[in-house]
Each structure stands twice: as C-alpha cells, then as structure tokens.
C-alpha cells in the first residue's frame, strides 16, 4: 500500500494504512472540539509497516476494536503495535441477507445483486442490537475513567466505511456533534478511501465482469443516502439520537457528559 494520494489532514501518515483517520478536530458539544490523538477510525490494519507501528506506538496505548467477521480476520489479521490491546467483535447484522464482508461477493452473487437495496438494508440494521457497538461504548467509558486516562481507541473494519461509519457516528453523537458533522465525517471516506478503492477495483477487474465490477464499485462508495438511512432508522425507532444512545448503549446524559469532559477541549 502506498502513501494516500488524496491527502486530508485527518489521515495519519502511514505507509500501510487504509482510510486511517483521526476524529480529533471535529466540532462537538458546546462549541468544543474533539482532542486529537485519542479517537481513530480505519480500514484493515493488516498492511501496517514496521515504520507505521513505531509511529503509532508513540501515542496513547490503543484499544483496537475490529468489527470484521472471523474469516476476514483469519484472512488478513491485524498488525499490532507495542502497547495496543485487541478486541474482535463482529459488527455485521445477525442475518445472511446483509453482510459487510465484501469478500463474499462473487460474479455469481453479484449477477442477481441489488447493490442499492443491499446497502440500505445494511444501514437500517447496523445501529440496533449490535454487540460490537456496545463494546465500543464500554471502551469509550473506560478510556474516560481516571485509571485509564491515557488510552486511545481505534475502531476499524475492512475498509473503514460501513461498520466503522456507524460506529464513528455513535462516537460523534455521544460527544455532542450535530448531524452535519456526522455526515461530513462519513462522506469524507469517499475521498480518503479513494486510493485503496481504485487499487481494489483494479485487482477485482481481473476476475469480475463489467456488470459485477460496477455493483462492487457501488458497494465500495460512501453515499449520503447510506448513512442517512441509518440516521432515519434511529429516529423512527427511538425518536432521537439521545434515546438511541441511552437505550442501546447505556450512554445517558451523565455518561455522555463524562465522555465529553475527557475527549473534548
């Protein structure tokens, strides 16, 4: 993996990073901003170089939460750096109908595949009864506690878009960010993932036909319609994102205030 050609200030300077971004700097509660160097989102960590690991080890001790399925992890295990702790909690909905594991898509499955319907259903389901995001909530609260006040969190999936996109929305909302900030962060992936997406599609073009490749390209995109589907589903079920945070993840107003005291400046 080469250095990203579509540079953005939130991207970490990693040789083998995939869409590895710092959520720091985003506007959150009361006009405060998220501290840099504490909350990260990324794609797979399997291609990190020794230089990357040295760079990452200089920051706060990382709690890594890997949203990928077991077969994804087995195929491309994370490269861990010194001081990092690893948690693998799959975030895919408990259904064979929708699955963010893109490696399961083939010419045959893509032939009768409705990419848009697939993506919208994935985003309808991701926000609810999701053990991975419950784990994320717990890690956030642990990091904000006095005894763990030097820890950071890296949440990631395969490309850092869908499973990580909803997880990042959870973090941003818990810290008091508004919807426009959540949308902006999500849509940034369309740019920051571009080098890896182009590389992946070039490889897939060797084994997928044009129709299948077009479907795959759509699935690899970060469209506002996707994240808006998740946000609308949250609103329809709970009436507000605050109720969603409290009912699904135990993040009531008091818990959110504690997170904001630690993660914001």
Predicted regions and their residues:
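Ser/Thr-glycine-rich phosphate-binding loops at phosphate-binding pockets of nucleotides
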Residues: 159, 163-164
């Amino acid at each position: 993996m080469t250095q990203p050609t579509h540079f953005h200030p939130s991207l970490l300077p990693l040789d083998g990073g995939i869409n590895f971004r710092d959520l720091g700097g985003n506007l959150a509660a009361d006009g405060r901003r998220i501290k840099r160097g504490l909350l990260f989102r990324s794609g797979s960590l399997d291609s990190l170089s020794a230089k990357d690991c040295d760079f990452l080890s200089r920051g706060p001790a990382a709690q890594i939460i890997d949203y990928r399925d077991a077969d994804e992890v087995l195929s491309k295990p994370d490269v861990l750096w010194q001081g990092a702790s690893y948690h693998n909690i799959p975030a895919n909905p408990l259904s064979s109908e929708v699955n963010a594991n893109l490696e399961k898509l083939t010419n045959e499955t893509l032939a009768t595949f409705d990419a848009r319907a697939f993506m919208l259903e994935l985003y309808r389901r991701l926000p609810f009864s999701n053990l991975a995001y419950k784990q994320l909530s717990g890690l956030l609260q642990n990091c904000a506690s006095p005894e763990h006040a030097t820890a950071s969190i890296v949440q990631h999936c395969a490309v850092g878009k869908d499973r990580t996109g909803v997880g990042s929305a959870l973090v941003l909302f818990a810290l008091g960010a508004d919807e426009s900030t959540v949308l902006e962060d999500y849509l940034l992936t369309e740019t920051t993932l571009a080098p890896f997406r182009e590389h992946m599609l070039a490889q897939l073009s060797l084994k997928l036909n044009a129709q299948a490749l077009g479907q795959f390209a759509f699935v690899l995109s970060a469209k506002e319609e996707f994240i808006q589907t998740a946000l609308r589903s949250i609103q329809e079920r709970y009436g507000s994102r605050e109720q969603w945070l409290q009912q699904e993840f135990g993040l009531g107003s008091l818990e959110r205030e504690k997170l904001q005291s630690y993660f914001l400046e």
